[in-house]
Amino acid sequence: MGDQNTGKLNLLLAELGDTRLVSSRWLRVHDYSNSLVARYVSSGWLVSPARGVYMRKGGRLQWEGVIRSLQVGEGMPLHVGGRFALGLQGHEHYLRLGDVGTVTLYGPGRPPGWLCKLPLAQRVEYLGKGPFDLPPVSFTVEVSEAELSDQGLAWHQAAPGADALVCSTPERAMLELCDGVSDTALVYEVDALMQAMTTLRPQRVGLMLRHCRSIKAKRLFLALADRHRHAWLSHVPMDGVDLGRGKRALVPGGRLHPAYQITLPGDLDEHLA
């Protein structure tokens, strides 16, 4: 292999490290021809865990490295949100057992097809743009904490030494989860989580409420926060928060919350641990 190609290989291996992946698209953009990539594979430098994506031979295929590759390497504004983000931040014992291992992604664009074909221990679920009208942010290493914070996002390490990922803060993740509530069992889950949300930041909650387009999500979030009498709720700035009009029937035969006009299951207390 010539000096130029050896240099290109070294750059690629440095980019990949032990846990990253690169797509065929990324390789084309960075001037790695199909024939050169095929040579790297046949020489034992690269492997393809799914069609259209490559990693270092002997590397570790882990969900953290995959998401980091999407966010920073591929430049896709997909963040870890909702249920899985809350689990990462210490609330996994409140989540339904079968959902703890599902990585929930949000963003304006669907992830590449190879993502669901990777042999990961976790399932990855794309839940669309989510309930917010916020503009997408580019998740480069140069993006500031303030830019992310204005979106209800933050860099988060899933474990010591793991890749840092862009995840929803608890304020945003709770509204994302409330938006996806479609049955009584999910209300029980969100209620248990809300009970634990004793340290949410009122200004951040207000910001997320103002940018949330889902009337259901906002009313459910506020009704459950009120039900658990969280001290921060009275400090949330409600100027510019649209809660819609009329009553919302979230569950059949439920009790109407007097302030936020949304029906909640009447047996919520019985389902709290």
Model-inferred region functions:
Residues 1-84, 98-110, 114, 196-225, ...:
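Short beta-edge/loop segments at beta->alpha junctions of small alpha/beta modules
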Residues 39, 84-88, 173-177:
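Residue-level signal for well-ordered alpha-helical scaffold segments within enzymatic catalytic domains
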Residues 91-273:
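Phosphate-handling catalytic interfaces
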